[in-house]
Amino acid sequence: MDSILCMILLILVRNHASEAARLNHPRVLLPIFEDKAINFTLEVDEPNCYKWSSSRQDLISVMPIYKGFSECAYQAVVTVRTHDRRRNTAIVFAEEVQTGETLRSDVIVDVIASLNVRTATRQLYLEEAPAMFELHAFDEQGNEFFTLEGIEFDWEILEPGSKRPTAMRYLTFTDSPYHTVPPTIEKFEADGKKGHMILLEGINTGTAKVTIAMPQAEYKHVRPVEVYISVLANIIIEPSEVTIMAGDSVSFRILQLKMDRLHVIDNNQYYLEVEDSSIAYLRGNSATGAALGRTQVFLRDRNMADSDEVQKGPSALLTVAYPNRLSISLLPHLNWVTVQGEHHAIALDLFAADGQKITMGTKYSINSEVDESFFAIVDRTRNGSRLFGQAKKEGITQVYGSYKDLSVQAELQIFEELQLAPTKVVLPYDPNSLKPLKLQFHASGGDNNYAWFSGNPQVIQIDTQGQATTEIRDVKSAYVNQEVLKDGGKLTAHTTVKVALSKNQKISRVAHIYFLPPERLQITRSNFETALKDFVHVHVGVYARINNSEVPYTSCDNLHFQLDFSQPILQLEGNEGAEAAHEACHVLRLRATAVGTTSLRVSYMYMDKVLYDIIDLYVFEPLVVLNPIENEVVLPVGSSRNIIYANGPQRSFTVAAEIIQSTAFDEKILKVSKLEFDTQNLITAFTVLCRELGETQFTYRVHNSLPTSSFALYQSEVTTKVHCVRPRFLKLYARHNLRDSCPLEKRTSLLFLKDPENKIEIEIEVHDSNNRRLMNISSLGLDWEFSAGEERYQKNIIPHRQISELEFNHGVTLPSRDLLVLTLSEVATNFRIKGTVSQYNDKLLAQHGIHAERPPFGIKNPQTGLIYTPLIENEIRLHAVNSTLLPKDYMSIFLASGYSERIPIAQGSGYLQLELSEAGIVQVEYNENTRILVLTPLRLGHVRLELTDRCLMNEPSHLSISVVGIGAIEVVSMDRLERTTRIEAIVRLFDTNDNLLLVDQSKLSAYDLSEVVADQSILSVRLGEQENVGPGEIRYTITGNQVGETKILFQSGKGIYKVASDPLNIQVFAPIRLFPRDSTLVVGSSIQVYFHGGPHPNTNMIISVEKEQVATISSTVVTAHKLGTTKIVGKCLLKNPVTGKDEVVSQDSVEVHVVALKGVQIRTPLVRIHSGAVMPATLWGLSDLSPMILGTLQNTKISWKVSQPQVVEIFNVFTTAGIEYQSGDLISVRVRALNPGKATITASVTLADGTILPPATVDLQVFKTLELVTPNAIKMDSILAAPRSILQLKSNMDNVVYKLDDRSNGIVSVTPDGLVHTKDSLGRDLIIATTADQSLPIGIEVKNVQYILVTLMPILKLRELEHKIPRGMNFVFKVSLHDNLGNELSHNIEDFNGLRYELGNKDDVDVQIDNNLTFALNLMRETNNVIGISLKDSTGVKHSMDFIKLSVVESDNLFPTKTIFSVGDIICFDSPLTLSSTWRSSNEQIVYINKHTGIAQVLSHRLKPGEKIEITNGDETKRGGFLKYDLEVRESDTILFVKSVDTFSGPEYRGQLVIRNHLQSEKYSNLIAQNVSKCARELGSVPVNFFTCRLAAKDALGRNLLKMYKVDALFEPSIGQYSCRLQLLTGFIELLSIVKTHDVYLELEAVVAKGVSDKMSLKLVPGIKVFPESVRVTDLKPHEIHISGLDKALLKVQVKPSDSKYFAVDFIEHGHGLSKYRLELFDDLPLDENFYILVVSPDTKQSIEVPIIGNTMLAPKCTDRRYGGPLVYRILENLGFVLTTTVIVIISIWVYMSCFQTQGVTQVNFEAFKKGKSRTELMQQSGRSSQDDTFGDSFNVRNFSPDRRRPPSNALSESYIYGHPRLNSSNRSENSTSFS
């Protein structure tokens, strides 16, 4: 017992101990950090009052957590305070205040030794919540630290490969919708740091490595943790199981589950892999069967490493089988009976032997046949297994299917579309009414054999004819469906009726039927009044309630309605055919039996509740027209008539009804007014007045209107037709006498009965063109004329008056008849009365404000088209009538088989006697019943027909008849038309009398016209519409079928009677199509619009812009001005000879969009390029704006910068030629890779308005080509080629045989002679070249072309740096092909690809494409253009176009700029090219040019106007760059002296003149040069042979002087003029002796080759002579100057010193013919300066300088010392000068022999040594003699030396950017100073 008690006590104690308070962690491990204190919270599980303490305050500190103001805490924060990096332990005590119980926790501090990551999974799924990863730390013993709160860690996601996308990303807890932010890392996320917990989210499938490291310096040794995490996707393969045939393919779809929905994945991340490639193989997602069998297809992820075996991807089962059976079915109902409008799919399926359906791809196809008129195919699969379509036409058709030897057939039956009416029905439910309701459902379509089904037969039954009968009895039956409504009420019953085809019951239509009890009755609509014997339709609506709203019954014919009438004037009749109004279910059809008023009450009782409604009804007499009885009015303009109506609705005084009367008519034609009168009768009258011509209906309507919704309009109306017409015929009625032979009755005889008052009443009737009598003619003016016997008509000779008789009807006036009343004393024989309707009564019309037509009663002449007033007249003969029987007296009839003319006889009695002047020409027949005269031609000729009226006493009528045929045919039409369009051709027929044939348009076949088209495939001709054609014209329509030219003619007749028109040549052209189709421009840019198609030649093409504020067009260049969109419209106009007007024969339009340039981008073909390679860099606009557009912008600044100039450099394509584009033209540049490295190219663009676009950059990497350095490699020939190219191998030896290596993979093929063909495959191959004892391996690599590069062929250079291309330049470019590394491909290929080009403006640049991938540009015009060069076949070429900016301007170094010259012109060409370039002329017989100097002379002219001579400078023969000048040479047909009158002094005279064409009115010199002085220096003597000079005189004295002068023609280079030179052959004294003091006049004439000449008059005034010609000063003694000449000239001579400070000239004396002057020298005369004496003679117009030559070797003090005789004195005096001259000559000879011994010998100019030359002439001639006589040599027999030295001054005038050519010469002397 004690043991038991002890046991119980121990258990109690144990339980108490177990329930005592405890700390949450009795042992805690915390980490140590240098600059971080780690916190950890200890907590007692019972919230009592505890005091906290620590055993080691140096290791840790304890901070209690107090709640409110209490000093008790059951929680405390332990903080690590030590930084000692070793393991220590401290104890935390928690003492309970009340009990003293102490709790302890051991806190261990230590350093972190390792890390580890804890997570629930190492796999993430796309589109799922991010996963949390938590880091844990451990000490050296593997114990885990309790907390890492507040410690920062480095988390890094590393991808296994750089090419794979990032698999996952960090996600903060704040951004995650699935997580809350943990308190321990809340501060870290705010600071953007990462702690010990993190979220990772998968964004792409793949595997990534997550590395976690500690950034603290004290823990750098801790090894980072690496965790591999895979990101997967929820993916399935569709189809999962499929059977295909061998060779066929099936496409698998990869579907990913995202947000519970499947999405198709179409990126390249996933790929499929087949398990057994012998059964099937894959290409992308398409599997192709290879052999019969079964295998699996697995899904692989490219982002997943090959070693990842985390998860086997989804798979599909693929079976390859052979077809065993073919089936056919009609989906979706699997029934071959259908109706129109149904959509079906005809399924043709193959099945394997095991019954598996075979899925077909595109390899095989099933043939099918179906009549698409029955079943319209909308779509079909490529393999033919599914035909999607719609049933279209009723009928039966067969559907066939076949596959190889398998076939199948089915019969498709299509019926009319199935329809059911009505589709929604609401019916009454009344348990007291057992009468079933019958409701007819109407079905249509199908085969009319329907199956009807009731949704609930207990409620409604339906028979086989669609008639439904309600059978509802007890709504509580279990078979009755009662539905609960929204308002809590119950639907009595609901069921459906369905109709279906009997043969295919899946094709059906459904109607819904609802049964409800009635709630309200209402008469919804009723016409409360009606006419007698007409009906009142009372529409009764009964309403039920559903969902708190009323719903009308569809039908309630089974309900019994009670009708109660107050007066029995209506009776109920059957309502068959009456359609109920809206919301009415029953119609009461009541017939009116009596006139009166009644009240009707309609009621119905339901469940002791009476539902009723009341309405008042009225009956009246029907509305009718009283007058006119025929209910039709015919009036002329301005006349009126009254119309009377009776009965109809009347005003009611018992209901609030308003009677409404209205009329409807055309107010332009009629004016209507209502007549107001007081009458007891129910009469209404209106007056209608015709305002203008036309027909209209006058409708009178009257009804009563009630302001209630149930009111139904019952309108009474009567319509009267009113004709407002022109008068056309006048009829006069009286009693007449007839012939005895007349078969007419005697009552219409012409017997006049005289009354007692001698009055004659003639009834007047005016009819319109339809012979309708006008009811009132008061607005017409009638003129009356009278004649007795044979007298002419006279007006107003007999008293007469015109009256209108009226009648009255119910007080309304109505017209009766119009009469002409005459008063005659007697009636003469043949008394005639003629009435004429000539005009309107303008006064009456003015009263009504009516303006009648002008001319009055005008009709149109069908022949002339003019409007004229017809003759409206008639006459009465009291004893004889002279009526016109025929409308004309002449007519022509066309002779043709079965052709006849029919003439109506409108006048006369109708009984005629016919007589022909000649028989056999025409046959005449007359039908008295129809009164038609029929003329049938028999042969060509002329005959006269006489017609006599058998009743009337009138003269016979005569008709002249000509029977004609077709004499000529003329065709008028346009000669050009667009393909598929039509033009009209007018064929004019002329008869045999050369008159236009009157063509009967209704009998065109009688003319036997036929057309003959030379080529019927080009155009077709058919007969056109024959409206609005002229006399003798037939319209045809010509349709263009295809492009081409052909001839067409029209002909008629056969044999000798055949007549044909002249052939008409017609061109059918293609439609004009503008290009480019749709363009996008920026403001300021331009583009050229061009067109294809149109007629040839197209001389009238007009291109315009719709919105000129957006863009404008000049010529064909469109320039953008404003943002927006506009259209460019091109029209081709041709004159239509038919209409005589210009017509648009073809047009097209394109859209131009003007957008803002927001930015640019740099496009380069490569971003990695090897050193030394060159590639283009081009600016493109955003988005995708071509350089072709940007290159046309004006005033745009583009700057290019390179971050590393040592890595790459930028230059433009013209740099090698000396053209450096400035910023405005750098749209495209070249990039050359220099050294390995990385560089950034930046392009900045500033627009014309100052807008700076964002800079565009591109990063380039330049790498070094991999080469073998050690050991030294043997260099082997290797070829880099493009696919589909041909190369010819050639070695240095003969008899070499080429073949492929035995291990060749077939990439290329080679012939034994070395012709290599590359194929489409890429890769490397090896060719072996073998001889008898050697072999050479030749490697060849076939690579795709990455880009093309256009390079200027460096053949020409410019002298000076240019920033634009000089106009006239011709460049040659080559196009190189490069691979993806920048290597140039071998393209010694014959027609590798061919080039094509695009130009911004095609008119400014001439492009010539060569066969060797080169092209030439001819820049003859200034332009701001861009050319794009590309390959014609760019297959496989990624960057197949290169762009070059062409900025061409007129260069200052280019001369001449004009192009028209005439014979005799000397042209000094100037070129910006270097002096080494050569000049050439295309025809040296016309223009000869020195090939070195560029000086040309025009020798002759071309006979053809406009033919050009080409002058080139450069290297044209080697296809290099060159300049070209196009010269147009014209005949010199005008010669003109500079002066017409002049004076000359006698010894010599030169008359300057100019030779030119008559159009060159502004030409004054024949030397055309930019630098005349320079050109003159280089120009030698010029032979002149195209004009001659003659001297003549009119008086005897002048004729005596002619023999003393020599006259010749010459060219003076110094002044650039041609001259006629006179040279005196005798002495001057002899000339003076003859002339003496007389005035002598001579005439100088210059004559060109064709005799055109000009003359000038010369007055001979002998000049003065000065002696000595120079004064040599040896001392200061005076000198005498003698001047001889005529006395009259000497008296006016002026002699002046050049400087009066140092010497003076004094007059001494004047004798006969001689004047003397003294020269006085002053002592201070400087002898080292130049002085002269100036002699001026005004009469002879001479100015002579006499130089004073001083001796500087002698000092002034020695002037009196003499050394012997004069000779010795002279020698000693000039000894210094002689010695100096000798030394200079010797040195010059030595230099010449040393440096210029290879040069030609300079010709001596002997003109310099002739006597009688003035100083000025000597200087000029000496200057000319020092020049190269190159031009003279050019035209003389002497040979021209090409190495002739130019003068130094000329060389110095040039500047070169490539160095002086002579300085660069190899034989130049090092010490030469010629160019210094």
From Swiss-Prot:
Tissue specificity of this protein: Expressed in adult male accessory glands (at protein level).
Perinuclear space side: 21-1775
Predominant cellular place of this UniProt entry's protein: nucleus
Transmembrane segments: 1776-1796
Record keywords, A-Z: Cytoplasm, Glycoprotein, Membrane, mRNA transport, Nuclear pore complex, Nucleus, Protein transport, Signal, Translocation, Transmembrane, Transmembrane helix, Transport
Membrane topology: Single-pass type I membrane protein
Region (Disordered): 1819-1876
PANTHER family associated with the record: NUCLEAR PORE MEMBRANE GLYCOPROTEIN 210 (PTHR23019:SF0), NUCLEAR PORE MEMBRANE GLYCOPROTEIN GP210-RELATED (PTHR23019)
Family label: Belongs to the NUP210 family.
Name of protein: Nuclear pore membrane glycoprotein 210
Species: Drosophila melanogaster
